[in-house]
Amino acid sequence: MEAIQEKTTAGITTGNFQIIVFKQGEEEYALHIDQIKEVVITPTITRMPQTPSFVRGVANIRGNIIAIVDLEEMFGLKRTIPMAIGTNHLGKNFTLVVQSEDLKMGILVNEVPNTLSVSQKDFDESVNIINDSRVNSNYIRGIIKANQRLIILIDIFKVIDHEMLQSIKKTA
């Protein structure tokens, strides 16, 4: 018999859930595994004119042209890896391809992201203290406590507001 799982207000089911963990700046962030289509080595990125600075450009991933977004730039975080000489992707070697019904885009990351199984008891969804005029304030789904670390679980599609979404759609 299948166990019935209740959804919390953040959309996370009770019990265990899977996340993809990656670093941006000095902090660890995570996305729910359902938001990730694949992880690829960052391809050549073609810069597009008149796009926000956090949109690094577009790339061809498996025949699809998608916008590539730099969360360090978007969040105003201190860069952990400087621009690599002879490249256009800031030394960020991997791209998380995320997809929703409305949008498909890539998120630049420095290292191979890790998959982590999280118990509901290690997830605190009451954290909604960020108020940033550049992004939707509801993008933080909660904080995960894992082995003396705090990991910020974000909803990538809430990070992108309507104006940003239109800009990204025009890019790709």
Where are these regions (language model features)?
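An acidic, low-aromatic, low-complexity terminal/linker signal
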Residues: 1-172
